[in-house]
């Protein structure tokens, strides 16, 4: 990535790289070097009438310029997964609404993923009213999509990843300010990350059983939109009082988390979401907020983040925060207006929908998704 920045700064069309000058294991270094260069080169320009032609020639010489085939396959899969995530996040809201998003996931069947799409009729039958309530003000449909990858011959428990897919978030009746609302196309970044991950696992034929679950909605004001004060019943059977329709991501995740735990009985669940602005106040764009009910899983995610540069910082969960989301009229409310701790109370809310003590972690990635840097 740094070398790519160097290239952009110097604006030369051709570079020569001598692999013999590298002291580290070149078979490890070269693959990562080229992978980082490719990731940094990503541009989303499909709506530009005139596209820049920034072709650079990089010649690798020396006796240590080979990359093992298995590493080539792995890096290519990682690249395609990451680029697919970026493409989804970069699409404008008028293009990638929930109907279109769900359709785009169907071709993933061709690479070995089992795709199942639950439309509003199926979701209503299942009782996923917290998810459905978020999208009821939109003319677009709401969906839950499951993506299964079976890389092991046995029936071992899968790893589960759940993503928030609010394709555009106006805030609903609790309308957001106009300034920067255009960035709310990124409010589906958690779901896009899960989709990219599942695509990468399938392309590299990963030896693991995994499932990705994404809730796809559009949060719009309208004659049928959810109102502050509404009470809805979740898939879990727990009821939620909606105090603010702009605290909608947790409502989408609530049904998705319970369904994932109940249907797949996974080893663990990791959910990813642009859930709160409060996490940006706390951590900026350098760290994702990590909340977990399991120390082992938390440590694994922290270690993985340090190795890859995708850093996380563990934040607190504690029963003492429960009073901030308890409701007088329902089992809980979707936001608290006093007491602060916005990111923690959001995670505390999600934890209530993990019913069987499954190891679970919540990654609040708002800082990364909305970063301008």
Spans of features found by a protein language model:
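Short amphipathic alpha-helical segment within the helicase RecA-like ATPase core
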Residues: 1-165
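A generic structural signal for tightly packed, nonpolar segments enriched in small/aliphatic residues
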Residues: 12, 85, 99-373
């Amino acid at each position: 990535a740094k070398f790519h920045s160097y290239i952009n700064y110097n604006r030369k069309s051709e570079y020569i790289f001598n692999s013999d000058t590298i002291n580290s294991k070149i078979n490890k270094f070269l693959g990562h070097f080229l992978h980082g260069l490719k990731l940094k080169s990503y541009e989303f320009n499909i709506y530009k009438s005139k596209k820049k032609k920034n072709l650079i020639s990089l010649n690798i010489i020396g006796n240590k310029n080979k990359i093992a085939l298995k590493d080539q396959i792995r890096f290519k899969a990682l690249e395609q997964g990451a680029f697919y995530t970026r493409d989804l996040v970069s699409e404008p809201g008028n293009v990638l609404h929930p109907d279109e998003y769900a359709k785009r996931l169907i071709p993933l069947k061709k690479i070995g993923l089992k795709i199942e799409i639950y439309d509003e009729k199926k979701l209503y039958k299942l009782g996923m009213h917290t998810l459905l309530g978020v999208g009821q003000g939109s003319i677009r449909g709401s969906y839950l999509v499951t993506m299964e990858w079976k890389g092991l011959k046995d029936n071992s428990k899968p790893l589960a990843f759940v993503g928030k897919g609010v394709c555009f978030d106006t805030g609903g009746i609790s309308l957001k300010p106009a300034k920067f609302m255009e960035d709310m196309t990124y409010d589906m970044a958690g779901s896009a990350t899960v989709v990219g991950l599942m695509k990468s696992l399938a392309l590299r034929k990963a030896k693991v059983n995994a499932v990705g679950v994404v809730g796809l909605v559009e949060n719009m004001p309208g004659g049928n939109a959810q109102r502050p004060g509404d009470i809805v019943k979740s898939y879990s059977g727990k009821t939620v009082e909606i105090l603010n329709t702009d605290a909608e991501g947790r409502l989408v995740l609530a049904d998705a988390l319970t369904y994932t735990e109940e249907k797949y009985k996974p080893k663990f669940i990791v959910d990813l979401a642009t859930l709160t602005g409060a996490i940006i106040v706390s951590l900026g764009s350098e760290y994702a907020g990590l909340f977990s009910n399991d120390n082992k899983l938390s440590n694994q995610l922290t270690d993985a983040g340090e190795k890859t540069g995708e850093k996380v910082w563990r934040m607190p969960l504690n029963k003492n925060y429960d009073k901030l989301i308890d409701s007088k009229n329902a089992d809980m409310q979707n936001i608290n207006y006093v007491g602060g701790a916005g990111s923690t109370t959001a995670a505390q809310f999600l934890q209530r929908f993990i019913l069987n003590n499954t190891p679970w972690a919540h990654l609040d990635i708002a800082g990364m998704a909305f970063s301008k840097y």
